Regions:
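Self-processing/autoproteolytic domain segments and adjacent N-terminal interaction modules in large
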Residues: 5-7
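Terminal beta-strand-rich extracellular "head" domains
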Residues: 43, 49, 54, 65-169
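Glycine-rich, low-complexity segments
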Residues: 16-47, 169
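Short Gly/Ser/Thr-biased coil->beta-strand turn/linker motifs
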Residues: 1-3, 13-17, 23-24, 38-40, ...
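Surface-exposed, glycine- and small/polar-enriched segments that build interaction surfaces at terminal
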Residues: 9-11
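A short beta-strand-loop element at or near the start of a globular domain
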Residues: 55-61
């Protein structure tokens, strides 16, 4: 069988035919383990610079509310790290869920030359099991872990992003 939805009277044929089936992704109330249930994406196009040797907030953040306590959150993204003209300057980038650092070890990038505004995209990922249906906020923080120059996340019209995917457990 099928369900037919007829469009209003206009020029041409405008009929949409849908199969009469159950259990599709659109109507299933018990998704299979591994199904993607929702996606949150945040594109960050700004700049935060520091010489700090302890974590500072980059501005790259996104929040997702899991629909089940058995869900996992797949976090992927990339932070564009920019280094000033200082030899051996490095950056440590950490992924946090609230105040808890999820990435151990953290992600690192660095330069050993004194060029101006060296840049490096630093990809990151984590599969987190929050075991909660409360809103989960993921934040990228960073600091200068080596050298004497400043480090920045974003600059020179570069983009950074974070994407959160709820995966059914």
């Amino acid at each position: 069988g099928a369900i037919t939805v007829a469009a209003p009277a206009v020029a041409g044929t405008n009929t949409l035919t849908l199969p009469a089936s159950t259990g599709t992704v659109l109507t299933d109330t018990a998704p299979k383990a591994g199904n993607v249930l929702q996606v949150v994406h945040y594109l960050w196009q700004s700049n935060v610079s520091t010489t700090s040797t302890s974590y500072v907030d980059s501005g790259i953040t996104a929040t997702i509310t899991p629909s089940s306590t058995s869900s996992k959150i797949l976090v992927i993204g990339s932070a564009n790290a920019v280094f000033t003209a200082a030899v051996n300057t490095g950056v440590r980038i950490g992924l946090f869920n609230g105040a808890t650092e999820l990435t151990t070890p953290a992600f690192y990038a660095g330069y050993d030359t004194a060029s101006t505004d060296n840049q490096r995209n630093v990809p990151f990922s984590n599969l987190h099991s929050p075991s909660s249906t409360s809103a989960q906020t993921y934040i990228i923080k960073f600091y200068r872990n080596t050298g004497s120059g400043s480090v920045a996340i974003g600059a020179n019209d570069s983009n950074s992003f974070i994407t959160l995917m709820e995966i059914a457990g």
